[in-house]
C-alpha cells in the first residue's frame, strides 16, 4: 500500500512540474519585458535592436556585454509588450521589430547558438 502512495506522489509531482512549464509558456505573452519569473536576466538576453534582416529572419541585438545575432525559425513567437503604453500585450511579427526597440530573447534550450524560442519587443508609448 505504501508503494502505491509513493507512485501516486511521484506522478503528481511530475504532472505539477509539467503543468507549470506549460503555464509559463502560455502566459509569457502577458508578462512585461524583463519580468519573466526564473528566466529574465538568467536565461534571456535583454538589450536593444541594432539591425533587422527580414530576408534572413535575423535580428541583431546589443546589450552591455556585446552584440548578438538572433536567428528565428517558423515557431519563434514574437510578443509585443505594450504595458508602458497602458495597452494589452499582443502577438507580433518580425515587421514589428524596429531598430532601437528594447527586446528580451529566450533561446531554445537556453543556448545562444540556437534560434530564439520567443522574443519580446517593448513598444514605447
Which positions does each model-derived feature cover?
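Short, flexible, surface-exposed loop segments at domain boundaries
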Residues: 2-8, 13-71, 82-125
Amino acid at each position: 500500500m505504501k508503494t502505491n502512495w509513493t507512485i501516486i506522489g511521484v506522478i503528481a509531482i511530475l504532472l505539477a512540474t509539467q503543468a507549470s512549464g506549460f503555464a509559463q509558456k502560455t502566459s509569457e505573452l502577458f508578462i512585461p519585458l524583463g519580468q519573466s519569473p526564473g528566466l529574465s536576466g538568467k536565461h534571456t538576453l535583454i538589450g536593444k535592436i541594432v539591425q533587422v534582416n527580414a530576408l534572413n529572419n535575423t535580428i541583431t541585438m546589443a546589450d552591455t556585454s556585446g552584440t548578438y545575432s538572433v536567428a528565428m525559425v517558423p515557431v519563434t513567437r514574437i510578443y509585443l509588450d505594450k504595458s508602458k503604453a497602458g495597452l494589452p500585450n499582443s502577438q507580433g511579427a518580425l515587421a514589428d521589430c524596429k531598430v532601437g526597440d528594447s527586446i528580451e530573447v529566450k533561446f531554445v534550450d537556453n543556448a545562444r547558438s540556437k534560434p530564439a524560442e520567443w522574443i519580446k519587443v517593448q513598444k514605447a508609448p
